[in-house]
Amino acid sequence: MELNFTLNGALRTVITPAGENAQRVLFNQCRMHSVRNSDDGFGFAGSDAILFNGKVINASLLIAAQLEGAQVRTAESLGSWNQLSLVQQAMVDVGVVQSGYNDPAAALIVTDLLDRHPEPSRDQIDDALSGLFHRDGGYQQFYQAIELASSRLKDPDYLCQIAPEFRDDLRHIGKSCPKVDAAKMVQAKPCYVEDRVSEDALVIKMLRSPHPHAVITRLDVSRAEAMPGVVHVITHLNCPDVYYTPGGQSAPEPSPLDRRMFGRKLRHVGDRVAAVVAESEAIALAALKLIEVEYQVLPAVMNIGEAMAPNAPLVHDEPIVYMAGAPADLEQQNACSVRRGDEHMIINFPIGSRPHENLAASVHGQIGDVAKGFAEADEIVERTYESTQAQQCPTEPHICFTYMDGDRLVIHASTQVPWHVRRQVARIVGMKQHQVHVIKERVGGGFGSKQDILLEEVCAWATKVTGRPVTFRYTREEEFISNTSRHVAKVKVKVGAKKDGTITAIDMDFRANTGPYGNHSLTVPSNGPALSLPLYPCENVRFTVNTYYSNICPTGAYQGYGAPKGNFALTMAIAELAEKLGIDQLEMVEHNRVHEGDILKVLGAIGEGKMPTSVPHAASCALELILKQGRELIAWDSPKPADGDWRIGRGVAIIMQKSGIPDIDQANCMVKLESDGTFIVHSGGADIGTGLDTVVAKLTAEVLHCPLGDVHVISGDTDHALFDKGAYASSGTCFSGNAAKKAAENLKEKILFHGAAMLGEPVADVELAFPGLVRGKLGEVSLAKLAHKAETGTGFGILVGTASYITSELAFPYGANFAEVAVNVRTGEIRLDKFYALLDCGTPINPELALGQIYGATMRAIGHSLTEEICYDGKGIPLTRDLKSYGAPKIGDIPRDFRAFLVPSDDKVGPYGAKSISEIGVNGAAPAIATAIHDACGVWLRKWHFTPEQILRELGKLEQQASA
């Protein structure tokens, strides 16, 4: 079918199959990279927004035939190749652009809005952006960007302070500046994996299990293999016989190596049955229908209680092999195992695992005398709190593209962990690490989900077998049933306190549901107590962590990494105890909270796959100022008058996070001086939209006294950078950042040495000076001149600084969330009127990006608290398979008064006093909202997310108690 239409002012003619989707035509044939597919045509995400005959519409909702004769405008029409449009510049300046995946579409929508309404109201903004799913940024900064763009329409030279500034003694650190990669993302320049896929690439489509628990008894792929255009079919019969964990963690991984690329036993709906590798997506999908499979359906276990039950069906019944530290009864454990060929599970070292009891991992410990502490208490509360299954929902689905370059395998990946991908894939497909080149492209959102290896190994194996380029991309349905998600948890907390509110003992029993595989099954749940108990230092503390296998869809890493569930349970228990004692919740928090300098004794008993080498302390903590400021902002002590059926309540939660994993992880960096006096940084860090490349560039420029524009960062490329553990555990700033700072300092020493020689002065008399000078007492020399000298035949060789960063110290960001809700006692409706997130991340390296991280993380946490959940039917079949039914929030769902604040402290671990920022924001919304709900209407909601039905049910119980 021939189509003729006008695209960005030019006539276009394309030939496309009848019934083709307009988004695919614009992206694949017209190479409009701004028209991206995020939700498979559901029309929810808005990343495919175009102007169609002057109106904003999602291209995926159009069939190609509707393009005939149409006027189509995409984000490529904004600005020019090397010049941002007014709206794009405002978005970049304010810090809206993080992962960037749907920001070109956002820029087009906002441009259309300002064309129609040069000074739009909030309602007009909300209406215009109502079709955009902006998972990473949290929406709030769009108002600021639109206000800035509107002001510049009237005055092109209009300037305003984008964000507060910090550290007057520094040039770059603590000052706002655009992300170094923001322009290319908002302009839709090719930078994501899908932009790299070659036209001759084969396509993988996966046949997945329809059952939560089953064994394949017959598998016939012969008809699929015989289909024209099918190149290969991968099954458990011809895949590598290698066991691994999908979890992207440092080796040896603290997770069971409990999966094979394909296995006979299927452990969740969506588990892999067979992969068709074909010349096109259409052929691959057709071939899937030709595969014949017979299953022996097994009883499923879907929750912790079922998994713990005596004689429960076993999710993993295969033999167990230990690499070290095998338990004395291993032979007895294996005696009852089921042998299917050579299937087995590998455990690297003891993690408290008993798979044949559905126990994936466990850990326990205590400090002090818990029994004595409870005996000293005047009041004790013991409660159980639960969380549901939440999904990360990155706007860019998982995607991979692989090809052979000679005898080397090249992997373009949307990943948080390029070096872990290289190590894992090389082992799985039988290659050496130097034969595998992983290129982390820009990542359209991760939030933990792209820490795991979920499709890279299949794509790599297909390329190795066929010798052809191959691409594999998840559908949004696959994101829900085959991607990882947040662990479901059930946490029992017992807290005792004296009459004055002093906590005397805490006992936390943390039980987690890891689903079908054990990736992160030790480390995520152990962070539940590890990132909540230290907020309330107590002499007598006990914790127990047990993680169980089940047949729900997979779980894994998600921002907060266990902290949200532990913090919810502990905050709620302390709030309930405060009520029993007749003490205000905020006063109870103030009375027991951590203070700067406190020894965090409980962390001496909790490791993350390895016991700590020392007991950490709160080296920097701005909670005193945070709580004072939050109390004033939310008017904590002011009256809360009812409004008809609406009742007003306020709540608070304090939060903490780590900044990397001491004694386990490592980062490396190299900084090279170029012959014109500029610098290239080879950073192993993985920027997944957090602005890490900008942080690395700013740290380098600060040390070397040069303009930020003189620093270029190459990162996340295993051929062209140095090893780094990747983007997880809030490690970017402290680990990758410190490595960059140390490498720059190493180079600085060499520059000063050779600069002093060129000036004929002692090294002690010279220093670096802005912009790019070595200055002595008698004269100065430019870095360009020095670098040119280095490369001449009589020079001293190119100047390169390198550094490795490891540490045994912890840097803890702290914060508090304050919420004000209105609850309708007739309908149960919850309205989040105010939400204030105040965070201490040390010295903010880039303030506007830090604020964006807070808004995005907080909004995800609000979604988890009020609307988001993966649901199952009574047979264990997941019902949630798209963003809309999942309940992901949009701009109309944000609090009407939503503010974020940076409260600085000076930490000694991070570079220039910086601490992490990206994860901590998800840790506090649930308890802040839940305690506010209680303050409003008197009910305690102990399972999140919170629903009107829960409130009405609990209000009914209160009425029954009152009338009894």
Where are these regions (language model features)?
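Thiamine diphosphate
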Residues: 423, 437, 442-467, 471-473, ...
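C-terminal catalytic domains of large/alpha subunits in multi-subunit enzymes
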Residues: 237, 337, 430-437, 465-470, ...
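Flexible, low-hydrophobicity surface segments
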Residues: 150-341
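Glycine-rich loop/linker segments at domain edges
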Residues: 95, 175, 181-187, 249-252, ...
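Helix-loop-helix junctions that connect adjacent transmembrane helices in secondary transporters/permeases
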Residues: 316-429, 595-678, 698, 806, ...
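Signature of N-terminal electron-transfer/Fe-S-associated modules in redox systems
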Residues: 1-165, 392
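Intrinsic disorder at enzyme termini
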Residues: 10, 106, 129-193, 630, ...
